[in-house]
Design a protein with these regions (language model features):
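Active-site microenvironment for binding and transforming phosphate-containing groups
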Residues: 1-284
């Protein structure tokens, strides 16, 4: 079996359930648990992109995948709270479960929401991706967690920094205490854009002077195409927001390069599946 473990993540196979865990977050395993699902046979899609319901069997399979992953990290899948993810910069604070005996998925309360924060124990915050960046946040001082989806549109809106700002302004966190872990996503090697998107990035990130920084953005030699490192952009703006360099932990894994184990929209096209990132504060 291919092992995705590296200096920042460990690849676990528990009773046939595969997932990654960040070594940094494992240092706090008495307080939190977390996972990023691995495998393209699992699919955590709970609704169509246009909000249409899934066929019953497909939804049931997603719930089974959630249950198996949650069981592997010893949390109750019925406590899953999932944002609907519409490439916004909106972040919710979850203070309680809404559905009593079912996961909180496809709820109007989390429509047009791409990030979620809580200080409540046992809630299992979930986001999903197939190339987009997912960020897990943890403040060990205030016992605050967050889970944020940042596609290229979310990155343009700086949703990662807005998550930090909400943790600071509304829940009493300090940026220097916050840990941010970046899950597998499409990387610069495969994130190719046309001039219209390139121009949007240049305009939004003038402060980074990205047009002159080939580590962030690089024009292809023979085409009007550009490769952009959205992960690096998030690292830089999070550091500017006050996070310590050593507290920004990157999985270093590209979804396209690892398409045999991680879902990728660019590889799978219309029938693409979704992986999930979970994080939960443990109860007493």
């Amino acid at each position: 079996m291919k092992d995705l473990s590296n200096e920042n993540v460990v690849h676990i196979n528990k009773n046939g359930v595969q997932y990654l865990q960040f070594r940094k977050l494992l240092e706090y395993s008495n307080v939190i648990t977390h996972a990023y699902s691995i495998g393209t046979e699992v699919n955590f899609r709970t609704a169509r992109a246009n909000k249409q319901q899934l066929p019953e069997q497909e939804f049931k399979k997603a719930m089974q995948d959630y249950e198996r992953l949650c069981n592997a990290i010893k949390v109750d899948y019925k406590n899953v709270v999932k944002t609907n993810q519409e490439h916004t910069d909106n972040i919710a604070i979850a203070n309680k479960k809404i559905n009593k005996n079912l996961p909180d998925v496809n709820l109007e309360e989390y429509s047009r929401t791409d990030g979620i924060i809580t200080q409540k124990e046992n809630l299992v915050l979930s986001t999903t991706n197939a190339d987009c960046i997912l960020l897990l946040f943890f403040d060990p001082v205030t016992k605050t967690i967050a889970n944020t989806h940042s596609g290229w549109k979310g990155t343009l809106q700086r949703i990662s920094v807005k998550t930090v700002e909400k943790m600071v302004n509304e829940l009493g966190c300090k940026p220097q205490d916050i840990i941010c872990c970046i899950c597998p996503s499409i990387r610069k090697c495969h994130f190719e854009v046309d001039k219209d998107v390139k121009d949007l990035f240049e305009e939004e990130f003038k402060d980074l002077n990205i047009s002159k920084n080939i580590d962030i953005m690089e024009k292809q030699k023979d085409k009007e195409k550009w490769n952009i490192d959205t992960v690096l952009i998030n690292k830089i703006i999070l550091k500017k927001a006050g996070l310590k360099t050593e507290n920004i932990i990157d999985s270093g894994l590209c979804s396209v390069c690892n398409k045999d184990l991680i879902h990728s929209f660019r590889v799978e096209k219309q029938g693409y599946g979704l992986n999930t990132a979970l994080i939960s504060l443990l109860g007493k």
